[in-house]
Amino acid sequence: MRTYNISPLWRSTIGFDRVFDLVDAARHTAGEANYPPCNVERLSDDRYRISLALAGFSPDEITVTAEQSVLTIEGRKGEKGRRDFVYRGISSRPFKRQFGLAAHVRVEGARFDNGLLQIELVREIPDAMKPRRIPIDNLAASDVQQIEREAA
């Protein structure tokens, strides 16, 4: 039996219900789609956090934009002269990472600390879309009026 991992597809959608949980698999995308590494955390029913590992970047080299239903994080290292590395294990290549946001999910803020960019998201469901309880009226038999009489 063949198993596919579709978790990379879920990482790019925030606030959507996972309709295909039973299919917990698909292709594993490699390369650019997985750089920089990130975590998507559910903090509560309506709060999420995206954390990106951006070692070697500074806050002024990173751009975070939210436009309609897409959150885009871009980074580009500034040129600081030529350096001669014997071994280079910390990547500094430019990147662009996008996340699809569900309806009513907004970006609350972002902070950068020790090479980790954290973006806070909150889902705000409008009152008109929230479930509400409908009261049921109970009419007693004495409140019912008879409209016609039975013929004799």
UniProtKB/Swiss-Prot annotation:
Keyword tags: Stress response
Organism: Bradyrhizobium diazoefficiens (strain JCM 10833 / BCRC 13528 / IAM 13628 / NBRC 14792 / USDA 110)
Coiled-coil region: none
Disulfide bonds: none
Keyword match Transmembrane helix: no
Annotated gene: hspA
Entry GO terms, CC: cytoplasm
UniProt similarity note: Belongs to the small heat shock protein (HSP20) family.
Pfam families documented for this protein: HSP20 (PF00011)
Domain sHSP, first and last residues per copy: 29-139
InterPro entries: A-crystallin/Hsp20_dom, ACD_IbpA/B, HSP20-like_chaperone
Protein name, UniProt field: Small heat shock protein HspA
